[in-house]
Structures are given as structure tokens and as C-alpha cells.
Amino acid sequence: MADASLRLITFRVGTETFVLDIMAVRQIVPYTGSTKVPTAPSFIEGIIVLRNDVIPIVDLRTRLYPSMQERTEEALVLITHTGAGMIGLKVDEVRRIVNIAGDAFLPPPPLVRGIRGELLIAVVPHGEEIYLLIDVENVLTADEKVELREADLAEANTER
């Protein structure tokens, strides 16, 4: 990564703290439930409607830790815009926004990249904490993006 500073939003999924580029996040909303859609792909928890936009919800806990059962009652949704359209990422907690120098980003070791391929793009030490930088474009695989478009759940939101 370049030497310039990057603003990241920190959030918790399970016991780990992850970060996303703040520019990828359009809005943060409380999770009050989602509507299940019978034709939706299995990786979509449901949909919400936000300002007349239908937004598919992906539970990052399920994506990152399929066997973890414990739930957070006060989950939040990070509304993000991706090449597949707007997607809501359900997380356990949003913590804060941090500025990180570009030279602080470290490549993940090969064994750790196994969190579904290229989803984890950097390890970011910051003070006493270690953040895991995920790529919002890779939350869904290429096949899942096609499946999502075919289900027509995000396509209407790609031009916003």
C-alpha cells in the first residue's frame, strides 16, 4: 500500500476487529431484522429497504466464522457499494474511525489468507491492537455476484 494515510472504520465480528476503507461505507444503520426472500441465494440473510433501495444483507459472522453460534443482540449493518451493487454487511459492533499510515499495512501470511481467498487483504497493527483489513469487493465470490445479479436483489442499486 502507498505511504499516504488511509481512514478506516473498525468493527467487530465475533471476538476479532476488522477494518474497511471508510470510503466503501455509505451508511451505518441498526439491524432491526431482515426479510427472507425465498429465491435469494443462501449467502443472503435477507433484504432491507432503505430509502427505497432494496439492499441484500450478508452476515459477516456467518461468512467469516460459520461454526460460531453466539449472536450479538445489537448488530449493525454497514451499507456498502460494490461492483455487485449495494450490500449490507451485518456486524456485531462498530467501534471507531482510525487513520493508518500506508506503510503500516502488512500482507497476510499465506496460511491466513484462507478466510475465503482474497477477502483478507492486509494485517494492520495499530497500537496494542491488530486489525484485519477486508476487501468489500471480495465479500462475495465471483460466482456469488453472478448469483446475486440473477436473483435481481442488488442489480437495481448498481448505478447509484
Regions found by a protein language model. Name each.
Residues 1-160:
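An acidic, low-aromatic, low-complexity terminal/linker signal
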